Regions:
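Extracellular "spike/adhesin" assembly and maturation modules
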Residues: 1-36
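Extracellular attachment/recognition segments
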Residues: 65-67, 75-78, 134, 140-223
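Surface-exposed, low-helix, low-complexity loop/repeat segments of extracellular attachment proteins
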Residues: 5, 10, 19, 56-64, ...
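Glycine-rich, low-complexity segments
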Residues: 26-58, 103-137, 141, 164
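Glycine-rich, flexible loop motifs
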Residues: 31-96, 169
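Short, compact, well-ordered microdomains
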Residues: 97-107, 205-214
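Acidic surface patches and DE-rich sequence motifs
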Residues: 79, 89-91, 102-104, 129, ...
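Beta-strand-rich, repetitive solenoid scaffolds
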Residues: 11-13, 23-27, 87-90, 98-103, ...
Length: 223
């Protein structure tokens, strides 16, 4: 007696049944329709919102996406309550990278960058964690003119504009081709001294004349 599969409803003839090409072709059509409906084996399937993309497959939408542009999104469900989405921008712009989010019992979590493009002044939530908290990244670019006094320690406070700054994970900085800390030929030192809830503090016992542009990359958690 013939039976059917539980997922696609494919017909499974009994060993005693005669071969039937119609049954075989129907099974092929069911498999093809299933793969097409989930974007597997073809182009990503268009959907009204990525918020509704919960079945395994490859989908495409600009609603519920990381940005207003269309994204190809791979959906990996563990079960009905735990789902992971990995989204890629559908354009050829190489600066837009992969993002990821998950849904648990409390709904969809925010999109997180795997490798953020690090445009100046933009805050990025990333997939990195520190002490179980989400790690954010931000690049601050700041220009100064004629700072410091020789043989006297001076401080430069650079506002970072980060709301709810929590714990500093790391801070790296450079000025042109010089990475901080910088020690010049006279032995004068410039370094990132501290990062608090409002400012990045550089300290120097040298003189930086003319216009200088400082670039600071921060990793941090939220309070």
């Amino acid at each position: 007696m013939a039976t059917t599969t539980s997922l696609l409803g494919l017909s499974k003839p009994a060993a005693s049944d005669a071969a039937d090409i119609t049954v075989l072709n129907t099974n092929f059509d069911l498999i093809d329709a299933f793969l097409k409906g989930t974007g597997i084996g073809t182009t990503a399937k268009s959907i009204d919102s990525l918020d509704n993309a919960t079945a395994f497959g490859l989908y495409n939408s600009n609603v519920g996406a990381p940005t207003s542009s269309y994204h190809a999104c791979l959906v990996l469900p563990y079960n009905a309550n735990y789902i992971v989405q990995i989204a890629y921008h559908s354009s050829t712009n190489p600066t837009v990278l992969c993002m990821r989010r998950k849904q648990h019992t409390d709904g969809w979590q925010p999109w997180e960058y795997v490798n953020p493009p690090m445009a100046a002044g933009v805050e990025y939530r990333t997939t990195e964690r520190c002490d179980g908290k989400s790690v954010y990244r931000k690049r601050i670019v700041y220009t100064t003119t004629d700072i410091g006094t020789a043989d006297s320690v001076s401080s430069i406070n650079i506002p970072h504009g980060i709301a709810s700054f929590g714990e500093l994970v790391s801070a790296t900085a450079h000025m042109g081709t010089y990475a901080l800390p910088i020690m010049d030929s006279n032995g004068y030192m410039t370094l990132v001294n501290a990062v608090n809830s409002a400012n990045i503090t550089l300290r120097t016992n040298g003189v930086w004349g003319n216009e200088r542009t400082w670039t600071i990359d921060l990793k941090y958690t939220k309070a």
